[in-house]
C-alpha cells in the first residue's frame, strides 16, 4: 500500500524535477526522499526523529547524497526555506482538521507549486477503531490516527485542497490530497 501511495503522490509532481526544491515533510526512512532525488530534485528531508533521519541518510545511495539535506526537527519550520513542491506522506495522520489546515497553510505560504499529503479516510472501520482507542487509552501506544473526511478539507479551503485518490491495500488505507496555490 505504501509503495502505491508513494507512486500516487509522485504522479502529482513533474517527472523531471531537475533543480526543483522539494520538501519531504516527515521523511521517515527516506523512500520518498530517494525517489525525489533520483528524479533530479534538490530535497530537504525533514523528520522529528533523529533515528529515522539516520536510517534515511544510510539508505540513500551515495550518488544522491549531494542532492539531499537531512534535517532532524520540525517539518513545518520556516527555517527550512521555500519550496517548489512539498510531499507529506503519512505525516499529518495524527492531526485534527484544524491542525491539518494550519500545517498546510504554513507550508503553502512558502511553496510555489503543489503540496501532496495523506490523511486517513473517515471510514466506518477506522472511525470505530479510533473510538475504541480513545475509550481504552494506554501510555505505551503510538498516538491515534485521526480519520478525516476529505470533503471537509475541500470545503474549508474553498476547493484549494482536492482529493486525488484512495489507496487501500492490506492494512494500509489512506487518502492522497493535493493543495494547489
What feature does the model see in each segment?
Residues 87:
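A conserved beta-strand element that flanks and buttresses the S-adenosyl-L-methionine
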Residues 29-74:
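Class I SAM-dependent methyltransferase SAM/SAH-binding core
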Residues 95-106:
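A short, conserved alpha-helix within the catalytic core of class I
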Residues 77-81:
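Short conserved loop adjoining the S-adenosyl-L-methionine
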Residues 112-120:
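Conserved beta-strand signature within the Rossmann-like core of class I S-adenosyl-L-methionine
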Residues 20-26:
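Conserved class I S-adenosyl-L-methionine
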Residues 1-18:
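Conserved alpha-helix/loop element of class I SAM-dependent methyltransferases that forms part
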Residues 143-160:
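Short alpha-helix
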Amino acid at each position: 500500500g505504501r509503495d502505491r501511495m508513494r507512486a500516487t503522490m509522485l504522479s502529482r509532481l513533474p517527472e523531471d524535477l531537475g533543480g526543483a526544491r522539494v520538501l519531504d515533510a516527515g521523511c521517515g526512512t527516506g523512500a520518498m526522499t530517494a525517489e525525489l532525488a533520483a528524479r533530479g530534485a534538490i530535497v530537504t528531508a525533514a523528520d522529528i526523529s533523529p533515528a529515522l533521519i539516520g536510517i534515511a541518510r544510510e539508505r540513500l545511495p551515495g550518488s544522491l547524497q549531494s542532492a539531499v539535506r537531512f534535517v532532524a526537527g520540525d517539518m513545518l519550520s520556516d527555517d527550512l526555506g521555500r519550496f517548489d513542491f512539498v510531499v507529506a506522506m503519512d505525516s499529518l495522520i495524527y492531526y485534527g482538521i484544524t491542525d491539518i489546515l494550519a500545517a498546510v497553510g504554513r507550508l503553502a505560504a512558502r511553496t510555489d507549486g503543489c503540496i501532496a499529503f495523506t490523511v486517513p479516510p473517515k471510514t466506518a472501520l477506522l472511525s470505530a477503531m479510533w473510538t475504541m482507542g480513545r475509550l481504552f487509552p494506554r501510555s505505551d501506544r503510538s498516538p491515534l490516527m485521526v480519520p478525516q473526511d476529505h470533503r471537509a478539507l475541500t470545503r474549508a479551503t474553498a476547493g484549494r485542497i482536492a482529493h486525488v485518490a484512495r489507496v487501500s491495500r492490506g492494512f494500509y488505507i489512506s487518502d492522497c490530497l493535493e493543495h494547489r496555490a
